[in-house]
Amino acid sequence: MTVQIDPERTEIKHLQRIADFQGKRVLEVGCGDGRLTWRYAGSAGLVTGIDLHPDDLRIATVDLPSDLDDKVFFARADSVYLPFVKKSFDIAVLAWSF
């Protein structure tokens, strides 16, 4: 039996209610395996997902749907010391990042 995380898509419904991703540059902090990233990336302009865990980033990169190849990038980075210039993103997403 396969366990489905959030089969009702509650997470993405809440995110879309509070943020308009259409054409936006999005930074997802603590992107993990990319499970949530893919759900909004189709409408975003560009998504950069960062995480500290290389195993999760590897899964996110390998499992990335091919239609999102040119829109989603993953990098190992610490949210305390972001390796980006100011105002690089329009929206920041922190979901389940402790």
Label every model-predicted segment.
Residues L94-S97:
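A short beta-strand submotif of the Rossmann-like class I SAM-dependent methyltransferase core
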Residues L27, D33-L82:
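Class I SAM-dependent methyltransferase SAM/SAH-binding core
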